[in-house]
Swiss-Prot record:
It holds the Pfam family DUF2749. Residues 1-19 form the signal peptide. Its main location: periplasm. This is Probable conjugal transfer protein TrbK. InterPro entries: Conjugal_tfr_protein_TrbK, TrbJ/K_C. It comes from Sinorhizobium fredii (strain NBRC 101917 / NGR234). It is found in: Periplasm. To A.tumefaciens Ti plasmid TrbK. One of its GO terms (cellular component) is periplasmic space. Keywords: Conjugation, Periplasm, Plasmid, Signal. The keyword Kinase does not apply.
Length: 65
């Protein structure tokens, strides 16, 4: 095969892989966020993601001796 054919094939493969990557990324980004049921289950298991309340005086973490 001539050099021009090899270069054309390499460019074609690069273009196809770039297009496939862009389509995969866009399809994942277009999915809506988790439904309400999944979100509540996640918050129940992992916590709500809110900031923890401040530590009261005398309740600091210390060694258990």
């Amino acid at each position: 095969m001539s050099r021009a054919v090899i270069i054309a094939l390499v460019i074609l493969v690069a273009a196809v892989s770039t297009t496939a990557t862009a389509l995969i990324v866009n399809s994942r980004a277009s999915n809506p966020s988790a439904p309400e049921e999944q979100r509540t289950a996640k918050e129940k298991f992992f916590g709500a993601g809110k900031a923890l309340p401040p530590i009261k005086d005398g309740q600091e973490m210390g060694p258990r001796w």
